[in-house]
Amino acid sequence: MNIQGKFPNTRLRRNRMKEFSRRLVAENNLSADDLILPLFVCEGNNVEDPIQSMPGVSRYSIDKLLHKVEEAVKLSIPAIAIFPQIETSLKNVEGSLAFDENNLVCRSIKSIKKEFSGIGIICDVALDPFTDHGHDGLVINDKIDNDKTLDILEKQALVQVDAGCDVIAPSDMMDGRVGRIRSVLDNNNFHDTLILSYAAKYASGFYGPFRDAIGSGSKLGKDGKLTYQMDPSNSVEALREVAFDINEGADMVMV
């Protein structure tokens, strides 16, 4: 199975461009350099909202979020990952807020980079926080439309990188999304932006607490995300997904 990418989609130097990414991909070592701090952000001021299904974890307004980022910096954690809880009134069937340059994610990125320019910022690319149905893609005729979703994901990735995101992390599991995102980034001169692909994302009940945290799980329907996330019994398929994403230009992959 060939998992060797090709230039220009694959640029191994991207992983070496900044200190945080060099630390993240250092081999045969286990330290704070291998950690990513996930942070949940919400609207408001002075908000620290405990997530009931994740004991010890809270959602933070941007002002409070900065304190958590400061803690990460002091602990030498190289990167944080941002996940938004979008207010219900701002969601719609297309998840159009996902590519609004003034959305909660973009404002968070700008605030963090202003105070802590050296920490890496990883941003989730998927529509589930922004759609009123909670799916990762556009629902058309009761099906997830893969290719129309890719058009939205491209725009979502661009506004995040424009705001200062260092690593785009597509978690949507649409076919072809890594290649499309790599192309749109390169075409807009973001050659050094990393892509961390959720290469093999399983349709797992363990995502329940995460969906509670971002408020996206209540209207998924009886099949949930089975038509695009993977069957947990399929390990060979996982290797195929990893190979596809590397060939499309992913710099890092995770399961």
Where are these regions (language model features)?
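Residues that form generic nucleotide/phosphate-binding pockets
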Residues: 24
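Alpha/beta enzyme core
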Residues: 2-7, 18, 27-36, 42-255
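Acidic, Ser/Thr/Pro-rich intrinsically disordered transcriptional activation regions
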Residues: 13, 20-21
